[in-house]
């Protein structure tokens, strides 16, 4: 019983640590997404990245490189790009770049894994984008994309604003604030449940369980090709049940690597943050299930091929990383400290409070609108119930942590 209570407390603190690490990235991504929705015209977006040419894909990838690494924030921005007329390939290139090519992700990988995985992440990110482009070109989902655009236009937020009005009109700030709040309203349930499950898995499930999933792990010599391919396919399955996000799954990836999982399995696990269930749900709420499953299928095929290519690229070059070089998960309490995350969280917390004040003030003046995206389907009701249960679980676990003490 004591072990269960200790793990419960660790799970709650781990979840809190994951969210603490990602909060500023969520906020940054949703600010960018909100700004695109409020200020960018459809004509400008179509002109910039409206077609799947090298320039459009390159620009979209560069914008993704500069953006937040948070999966949910990237999803929101991608939806905004599509709604404003961006082509499917450039929009998906932005999504892949924002979760695979950002600088902070490389830093985290270097800390938990090794330099080879940093190279694999960035080279693999480029390969993912090129393979995605090829798959979309072959499958030609034009009719599906048109239906998605019709849905996004129906859900649109009215005429765009002039960004210069930020300096002279509080109404524009209020509109930006409402859009920002709507971004959070659409994903808070998925984020809460996903991060809570990640904390539970990190605390209760031993690393040996995940290494058991990957055939060829722990054997003498290099795994055979079919074992490498199987590990690349199973990597997304493991990620599906351990969703944390493009940043948070790196510590779990280090545990897999420390227990002998191949480079292909690790890279596939890392690349899989965009095809797990919470992400599928968010995409389905944006585009419908058919489009969400299409995107997941494209990403799955691309990441399996990419992971295998990276594995053999290192093997043939003699630069394969040494098994056992990773350090594993940090202690739950080690995620909280006075560092850049603390400063950024304070800054974006202040931005969020300011937006909240603007929304409240607009309602007090009779302005603003109330938006309810909760829905009434059984799936939405179930997810809301799970999110509320997650809050109870986390609150009780954090209280336990206070009584139990320790790291």
Q: What positions do the PLM features span?
A:
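Hydrophobic core segments of alpha-helical transmembrane domains in multi-pass membrane transport
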Residues: 30-35, 126-136, 194-202, 235-239, ...
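Transmembrane helical segments that form the transport core of multi-pass membrane transport proteins
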Residues: 40, 46, 177, 181-259, ...
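Juxtamembrane and boundary regions of transmembrane helices in multi-pass small-molecule transporters
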Residues: 51, 56, 116-161, 282-368
């Amino acid at each position: 019983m004591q072990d269960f209570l200790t793990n419960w407390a660790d799970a709650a603190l781990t979840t809190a640590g994951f969210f603490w690490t990602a909060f500023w990235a969520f906020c940054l991504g949703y600010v960018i997404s909100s700004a695109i929705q409020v200020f960018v015209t459809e004509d400008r977006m179509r002109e910039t990245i409206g077609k799947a040419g090298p320039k459009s894909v390159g620009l979209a990838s560069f914008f993704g490189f500069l953006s937040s690494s948070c999966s949910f924030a990237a999803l929101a921005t991608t939806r905004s790009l599509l709604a404003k007329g961006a082509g499917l390939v450039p929009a998906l290139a932005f999504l892949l770049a924002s979760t695979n090519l950002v600088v902070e992700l490389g830093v985290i990988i270097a800390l938990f894994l090794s330099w080879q995985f940093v190279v694999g992440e960035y080279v693999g990110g480029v390969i993912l984008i090129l393979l995605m482009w090829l798959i979309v070109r072959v499958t030609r989902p034009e009719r599906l994309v048109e239906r998605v655009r019709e849905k996004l236009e129906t859900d649109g937020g009215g005429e765009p604003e002039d960004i210069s009005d930020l300096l002279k009109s509080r109404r524009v700030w209020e509109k930006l604030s409402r859009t920002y709040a709507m971004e959070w309203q659409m994903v808070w349930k998925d984020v809460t449940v996903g991060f809570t499950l990640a904390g539970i898995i990190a605390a209760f499930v031993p690393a040996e369980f995940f290494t058991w999933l990957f055939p060829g792990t722990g054997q003498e010599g290099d795994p055979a090709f079919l074992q490498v391919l199987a590990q690349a396919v199973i990597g997304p399955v493991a990620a599906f049940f351990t969703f944390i996000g493009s940043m948070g799954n790196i510590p779990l990836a280090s545990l897999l690597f420390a227990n002998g999982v191949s480079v292909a399995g690790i890279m596939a696990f890392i690349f899989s943050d965009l095809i797990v269930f919470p992400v599928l749900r968010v995409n389905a709420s944006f585009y419908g299930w058919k489009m969400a499953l299409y995107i997941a299928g494209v990403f799955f095929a691309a990441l399996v091929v990419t992971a295998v290519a990276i594995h053999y690229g290192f093997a043939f070059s003699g630069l394969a990383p040494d098994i056992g070089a990773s350090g594993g998960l940090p202690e739950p309490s080690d995620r909280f400290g006075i560092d850049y995350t603390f400063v950024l969280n304070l800054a974006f917390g202040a931005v969020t409070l300011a937006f909240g004040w603007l929304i409240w003030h607009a309602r007090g003046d009779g302005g603003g609108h109330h938006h309810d995206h909760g829905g009434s389907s059984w799936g939405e009701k179930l997810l809301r119930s799970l999110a509320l249960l997650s809050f109870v679980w986390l609150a009780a676990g954090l209280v336990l942590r206070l009584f139990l003490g320790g790291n």
